[in-house]
Amino acid sequence: MAHSSEPEYRLYVTPRFDEATQKDGIALRLETAKVFASFQYDLSVKETEDPSRLHLKVLGLKTPPLSLPATGHARFSREYEKLKGEVEVTVEGIEGKTATVLLKIVPNRIQVVRRPKGSFLQVITTDHPDTAFEA
């Protein structure tokens, strides 16, 4: 169990440009702070999205297809094209605890306008897409 000063989840957000569609967007990865020794699980997440809000509700863990034993964080990754301007992102954990971050999303840049209260969620942004999801 995490100490109260350690986050339960980390949210990585980075700008993305889709060469195929020629559209700007963001890449988002939510992962557990906890490292699992047996498998690198996927997070099962229910998404609710509208133009200015994104709600991510963690439902649980699932083993990825073709999973081989590996150590790692449980993860959920997704790309979004429709989120622009000021966007509120809320993460809801399995126990119902929530944290909300306010992001300003413009092409090639993501700025944290308001960080979540408490230490449940750590938010990490980068303007360098190549390094955004490095372990």
Which residues does each predicted region cover?
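Contiguous segments within soluble domain cores/interaction surfaces
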Residues: 13, 32-65
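Compositionally biased low-complexity segments at domain edges in trafficked proteins
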Residues: 115-135
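A short tyrosine-centered beta-strand micro-motif
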Residues: 83-92
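Intrinsic-disorder/low-complexity, polar/charged segments enriched in Ser/Thr/Lys/Arg/Asp/Glu/Gln
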Residues: 25-27, 53, 73-75, 98
